[in-house]
Amino acid sequence: MNVRAAAANVLYQVVDRGNSLSTALPEAQQSIRPRDHALLQEICYGALRYLPRLESIAGKLMDKPLKGKQRVFHHLILVGLYQLGHMRIPAHAAVGETVEGAQALKGPRLRGLINAVLRNYQREQQALDEFSVSHNAGKYVHPSWLLKILQDAYPEQWQTIVEANNNKAPMWLRVNHAHHDRDEYLQLLKNANIDSTLHSEAMDAIKLAAPCDVHSLPGFEQGWVSVQDAAAQLSFNYLQPKDGELILDCCAAPGGKTAHILERVSAREVVALDCDEQRLKRVTENLKRLNLQAKVICGDARNPEQWWQGEQFDRILLDAPCSATGVIRRHPDIKWLRRAEDITALAQLQSEIFDAMWAQLKPGGTLVYATCSITPMENVEQVKAFLARTPAAQLVGSERENPGRQILPGEEDMDGFYYAVLVKQA
């Protein structure tokens, strides 16, 4: 299929149908040549990143919106506008390929309209670009409800957060310590002419100067290295697992944190629990590539009686289901799929899982509560509420008035993440 047509289909699936980009994009990639996968990804990610600006420009250039069965052609116009405004593709190629996309989408009669809209944008680009950022939705390209949360929670930092969310994310690696230490792998990258730098805190993290195909990484197929953001790798630092312990990774998919534990310690057993059977397949695949073994269980963390084997855990990593507002730069569709009311519902779910997991922790054991969110309701407020109702919970490494550590997007080039460490008093 024409790449621009495929991109329009992805935008339609995400924006109009509410499907996630992580589902829609791989499906679309199956319809195009492998060499075009990166181009399709760049167009889809970029168009979703700057969606309100593109929508406002399209609205100015069209007499009436395309509706119903023609909605996919509306998204094709957005694809064309993104290429012209944000990519280095020659204008004639961007316009020509986008117009041809209408043919691939079985709308040849709309080719003239699409061509006219894109040509008019070229003629009036400066004025239209200025108009597209003249309102908050276009200036910050975040939904108003999320912008308000960020402004209230981070009055001095919200603009930095927004900027980080709108930037492309770097590619972080986690070196498998069972094969190489980080300095050794850094040298392997250097030998392969791959520029990279170390992280100051995450002991196995390396940041690439530019993203690359994983198969070009030394020893990827042999399990020497994995792709994982440095903020997620810090889960190991906070959990501090020891040899011989019984450890639970709750809400474990896709398995990066489970693997990190196994790469670093000889636990008696690591249990990887998740309620999504399809996502658990990723856990199994990742462990297989890394030649690691864990007990993988499909079950609801709120109902341990369905899967628990009767022995409490020494350590529990609770990477709770969350709004994922800390990883928007990696998943720009979150801005348009998430709703304000989702935060309240997720906080309730987190609370239920928190209580259920605490009962599975040994006296003297450690539970690390983690999210990839930056909303206080899911993080600081969640932990405060848990401490208030759980006398045996002792907070470690932070103050009760401001529990845990909130990593903001872009901090040391990391994703947004939250960690709180709790010990169960005997």
Swiss-Prot record:
Entry's Gene Ontology molecular function annotations: RNA binding; rRNA (cytosine-C5-)-methyltransferase activity
Catalytic activity: cytidine(967) in 16S rRNA + S-adenosyl-L-methionine = 5-methylcytidine(967) in 16S rRNA + S-adenosyl-L-homocysteine + H(+)
Domain of life: Bacteria
PANTHER family: NOL1_NOP2_SUN FAMILY PROTEIN _ ANTITERMINATION NUSB DOMAIN-CONTAINING PROTEIN (PTHR22807:SF61), NOP2 YEAST -RELATED NOL1/NOP2/FMU SUN DOMAIN-CONTAINING (PTHR22807)
Pfam families xrefs: Methyltr_RsmB-F, NusB, RsmF-B_ferredox
Keyword Methyltransferase among record annotations: yes
Alphabetically ordered keywords of this record: Cytoplasm, Methyltransferase, Ribosome biogenesis, RNA-binding, rRNA processing, S-adenosyl-L-methionine, Transferase
Keyword check for RNA-binding: yes
Catalytic site: 372 (nucleophile)
Organism of origin: Vibrio vulnificus (strain YJ016)
Binding locations of S-adenosyl-L-methionine: 251-257, 274, 300, 319
Name listed for the protein in its UniProt record: Ribosomal RNA small subunit methyltransferase B
GO biological process, alphabetically ordered: regulation of DNA-templated transcription; rRNA base methylation
Signal sequence range: none
